């Protein structure tokens, strides 16, 4: 926060309930709303791959809860940012830094990505679709696939991964079934 003092929400030694209450009491309606929103990463809603001066006039000037699929090699920027891997990590770090330093309260962004059959990144390991994985009935193999996906996501700086649904599908046309 840019007020020159360490607020309760910024103090990691303060009780979590006090930190949450302090942060919420300081947030505007716009900031709260933005924390419930997801932007699709570079080349999509987030038109620029790297922060620009224009970002301070966009809706995310008040922060954003989540950026999905940032610098994963898909969208208009392709592999230009996703590889080498250091470039992909640098991109997320630079975007994160912008949100922490340029928004009023400095709330970090959650970077998410798909992981239903491996990390959704143009250089990550891809695995068979969930139906194919499930047909093996091999729980150990599925756990190993999940570990590879998690390790690759963590190494690239993603903080949350969307994974397969553990539910019986009612409609086989649904994308998460295939």
Task: Describe each PLM feature range.
Residues 1-178:
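N-terminal beta-rich core of secreted/periplasmic extracellular enzymes
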């Amino acid at each position: 926060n840019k007020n020159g003092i360490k607020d309760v929400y910024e103090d990691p030694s303060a009780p979590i309930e006090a930190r949450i209450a302090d942060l919420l009491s300081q947030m505007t309606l716009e900031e709260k709303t933005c924390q419930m929103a997801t932007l699709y990463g570079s080349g999509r809603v987030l038109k620029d791959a790297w922060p620009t001066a224009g970002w301070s006039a966009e809706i995310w000037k008040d922060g954003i809860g989540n950026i999905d699929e940032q610098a994963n090699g898909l969208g208009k920027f392709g592999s230009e940012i996703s590889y080498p891997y250091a470039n992909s990590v640098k991109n997320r770090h630079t975007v994160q830094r912008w949100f922490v330093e340029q928004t009023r309260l400095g709330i970090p962004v959650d970077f998410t990505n798909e992981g239903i059959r491996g990390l959704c990144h143009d250089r990550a390991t891809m695995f068979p679709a969930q139906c194919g994985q499930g047909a093996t009935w091999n729980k150990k193999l599925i756990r190993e696939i999940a570990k590879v996906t998690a390790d690759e996501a963590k190494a690239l700086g993603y903080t949350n991964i969307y994974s397969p649904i553990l539910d019986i599908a009612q409609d086989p046309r649904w994308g998460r079934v295939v």
